[in-house]
Regions:
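Class I SAM-dependent methyltransferase Rossmann-like catalytic core
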Residues: 1-28
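Short N-terminal helix-initiation segments at or just after the protein's N-terminus
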Residues: 1-5, 86, 93, 160-167
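Conserved short-loop catalytic and cofactor-binding motifs
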Residues: 8-11, 74-76, 89, 150
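Conserved phosphate-coordination/catalytic loops
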Residues: 13-18, 92-96, 156
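A short acidic, often aromatic-flanked loop/helix-cap motif at beta-alpha or helix-coil junctions
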Residues: 16, 64-66, 183-189
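Amphipathic alpha-helical segments that form well-ordered structural scaffolds
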Residues: 22-26, 48, 161-169
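Conserved SAM-binding loop
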Residues: 24-126, 222-227
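S-adenosyl-L-methionine-dependent methyltransferase catalytic module, highlighting the catalytic core
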Residues: 96-229
Length: 229
C-alpha cells in the first residue's frame, strides 16, 4: 500500500456538511467524469461535485436522494464500469452484506473506489478513558440500548482489521489500494509532549506487543482503490 499521500486536505470539519467539503477538497482530482455516491445520506457532496460539471448520482436513504435504494438488497441496479468513481463513506459498517457490497462498488466503478470505515477500537478506548458516549449508551452504534435502535454498526474491528480487509477484497476485485490514511494519524497518541511519551510507554507495557497503540487515537480511515489495467 502506497504510504505517499497523493490526496490530502488542510480543511477542518466539525459536522457532516463541513466534512463533505473536506472530502471534496481532498479527492477532487479524481471526482471527474461521473460519480456514484453510495449511501449519500443528505446529499452533502452533490452541489460540490456538480459544480465541477461532473455527473453525480446519490443512492440510499436520505433527504433529496436521487434514488431511494435499500443497500442490503443487491445487486445494485447499475451497469458494470458505469461510473468513473464510486464513493462509499460511512456505509459498509452498517451493512450485513459488507463483503458483497464491496464487490458491487468495484464492479460499478470504471476506475476509482473511495471508501471510509470507522475505528471502533478508538471509540472503545475513548469510553474507557473519558466516559460513556451519552447517558443512555456507552458507545454510539454499539452496546445494548433499551430501545431498538434505528441504526447500528454490524461490525466491531480495529484499524489493522480494516486495512487487511480492504487490501484483500481490493486484490480479489483486481484493484490496488493507492492510498490509506486516517483522521488524526499525523498526531501520536497523547500528543508529542512528555505526557504522550509516558502514556504510549505505559500502553506498550500493558498491551500485547503486536497492538499498534498509536492507532487507538486514529479516527475514520479512508481508502482509495484504483482498478488495475
Amino acid at each position: 500500500m502506497n504510504k505517499l499521500r497523493k490526496f490530502s486536505s488542510e480543511l477542518k470539519f466539525h459536522d457532516r456538511p463541513t466534512r463533505a467539503h473536506m472530502l471534496f477538497d481532498k479527492y477532487k482530482e479524481i471526482l471527474t467524469g461521473s460519480v456514484l455516491d453510495v449511501g449519500a445520506d443528505a446529499m452533502y457532496m452533490q452541489k460540490l461535485i456538480l459544480s465541477q460539471d461532473v455527473k453525480y448520482v446519490g443512492i440510499g436513504y436520505g433527504e433529496n436522494i436521487d434514488f431511494e435504494v435499500n443497500l442490503e438488497d443487491l445487486p445494485l441496479n447499475f451497469e458494470s464500469n458505469s461510473f468513473e468513481t464510486v464513493l462509499c463513506f460511512d456505509v459498509l459498517e452498517h451493512l450485513e452484506n459488507l463483503h458483497q457490497m464491496f464487490d458491487e462498488l468495484c464492479r460499478i466503478s470504471d476506475k476509482y473506489v473511495i471508501i471510509s470505515l470507522p475505528n471502533p477500537w478508538k471509540d472503545f478506548f475513548s469510553v474507557l478513558l473519558k466516559g460513556d458516549y451519552s447517558i443512555d449508551e456507552s458507545m454510539k452504534f454499539y452496546g445494548l440500548p433499551v430501545q431498538m435502535p434505528k441504526d447500528r454498526h454490524r461490525w466491531f474491528f480495529s484499524e489493522s482489521d480494516a486495512i487487511r480487509l480492504i487490501s484483500e477484497l481490493a486484490k480479489k476485485n483486481n484493484y490496488t489500494v493507492i492510498q490509506q490514511d486516517s483522521d488524526g494519524d499525523s498526531l501520536p497518541l497523547g500528543g508529542r509532549g512528555i505526557y504522550g511519551m509516558v502514556a504510549r510507554l505505559i500502553l506498550r507495557l500493558l498491551f500485547r506487543k503486536d497492538i499498534n497503540t498509536c492507532a487507538l487515537s486514529h479516527g475514520t480511515s479512508y481508502y482509495v482503490l484504483q482498478k488495475n489495467e
